[in-house]
């Protein structure tokens, strides 16, 4: 069983912790707020209230076999925590940062991965502003993303094979969501219906071109232009 520690229960730390608690992992918690720690005490392997963090304290709290640490603290505390975790040779040290500059600092002191929650949230939300068919959007890596889209009118009544998604739109259909909200794989013979919602993977620009294939709203061209400018800025 993997062992993961969450140092700091800010919004990001709590969100990660709640996801971890739903998995088959052993979780360790450290925070200076007793009330925050007590809320998860019974669900974790070890929950500690600690004002001052140092190498020796961490050594006592965390097992030598710890697999990863997630750090969500104030800047100075996060720098120290990342440095201490590096000294303890923890293989994976993930730190939340608010800027690229802080991310570089965290990397220098020992973080193996830096995450930017606000930046990632912006990447997910902004595309939704420009298309009525784009329901959700998740960047994966580089220019690759996964998007939940209403099937455009031009494909309704066609089979998956006839749609030629890869050839025409350079996209892959991962699955189709049914009326019960369940996703299922569909064969090449599947016929697209009016209310179908698909989960697609592909290049950001290709996904967003596909997202505006169907709508015939006023300002259609202006929306496309604005959206593509956004994508170009993000890729630059």
Give a label for each model feature.
Residues 1-236:
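Cytosolic regulatory regions of ion transport systems
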């Amino acid at each position: 069983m993997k062992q993961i520690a969450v140092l700091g229960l800010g919004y990001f730390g709590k969100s990660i912790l709640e996801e971890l608690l739903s998995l088959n992992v052993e979780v360790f918690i450290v925070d200076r707020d007793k009330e925050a720690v007590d809320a998860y005490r019974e669900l974790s392997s070890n929950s500690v209230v600690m004002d001052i963090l140092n190498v020796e304290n961490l050594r006592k709290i965390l097992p030598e076999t710890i697999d990863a640490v997630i750090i969500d603290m104030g800047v100075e505390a996060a720098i120290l925590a990342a440095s201490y975790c590096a000294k303890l040779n923890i293989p994976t040290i993930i730190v939340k940062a608010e800027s690229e500059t802080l991310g570089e600092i965290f990397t220098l002191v020992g973080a193996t991965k830096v995450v930017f929650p606000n930046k990632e949230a912006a990447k997910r939300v902004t595309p939704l502003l420009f298309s009525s068919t784009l329901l959700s959007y998740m960047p994966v890596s580089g220019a690759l993303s996964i998007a939940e889209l209403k099937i455009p009118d031009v494909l309704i009544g066609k089979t998956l094979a006839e749609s030629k998604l890869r050839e025409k739109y350079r996209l892959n259909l991962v699955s189709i969501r049914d009326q019960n909200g369940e996703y299922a794989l569909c064969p090449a013979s599947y016929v697209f219906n009016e209310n179908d919602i698909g989960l697609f993977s592909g290049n950001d620009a290709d996904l967003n071109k596909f997202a505006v294939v169907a709508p015939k709203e006023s300002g259609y061209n202006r929306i496309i232009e604005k959206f593509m400018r956004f994508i170009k800025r993000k890729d630059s």
